[in-house]
Amino acid sequence: MQSSSKTGASRRSWSACRIHATLGLLTLICAWSGLTAVSAAAASAPSHVKATQPLVALLYEHSAYSSPRTSAPLVASMWPKTPITGEQTTLPVIGKDNGRGGTRWLKVMLPGRPNGLTGWIEQGGTYSLVTGWHIVVNTSLRRVWIYFHGRLQRTFEAVVGKPSTPTPSGNFFVQETIIMPASEPGGPFALATSARSDVLQDFDGGPGQIGIHGRDGLGGTLGAAQSHGCVRLATADIDWLAARSRVSSSGADPLSTTTRCCT
């Protein structure tokens, strides 16, 4: 289990990773600074995807517990800024509890290991958001579907993880969207997700973090299972996707380099 999100990987350490996938679907929730992902078996584009997903943005560091009380075991410590770009940390909300003594709690999805990690955080020091964007990745068909408010917007062909390093299945979210330097593989953009490789505990100095990114400097045949677990898209497709997610260039003022999704 990854107990803290304080230590972030460099852009290269996760973006160069590749995921090998077994049969399944990866579904991503698209938050202001990320998307949500889910993996599961399917023969075609899902006919129904949830229209919206509630989110919460952190204003300061929060402790996530296994149940809605501070005496419960600590699951993770979440910083208010993402590790690579310094964007606002935004987490999908999957439950609520009014608690005792007036303390309100939120059950949220968390990044890191094990995949599917969740925890309870206090609602204080947060603000609410909502997203209508979802990404669904079918690793068997090697296809990516993009939904907005439950309606299919785009279908992309992808490179997914090879059998020895499969793309993990499950529900995840995009933590941050990164402009990749020309000298780094995986450009021109990379979406860092909350998922981690089930095979690689680390990769190129990073935590085996799964990304959705381009093929610059990497190649790979679209529609093939050839990566170490990450999902690679054609340049035009990752450009389109990145334009609908918050984007920040590492080392720059995130406010001056940020774009928000178009509706």
For each of these PLM feature ranges, what is it?
Residues 1-17:
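N-terminal secretory signal peptides that target proteins for export/translocation
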Residues 22-36:
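Bacterial N-terminal signal peptides
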Residues 35-43:
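Signal peptide processing junction and immediate N-terminal pro/mature segment
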Residues 43-50, 109-137:
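Boundary regions of SH3-family modules and the immediately adjacent low-complexity/disordered segments
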Residues 43-98:
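Beta-loop motif signature
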Residues 83-125:
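SH3/SH3-like beta-barrel superfamily modules
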Residues 112, 125-134, 162-173, 178, ...:
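Exported/periplasmic cell-wall-interacting domains
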Residues 123-162:
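A structural motif detector for short, solvent-exposed N-terminal "entry" segments of globular domains
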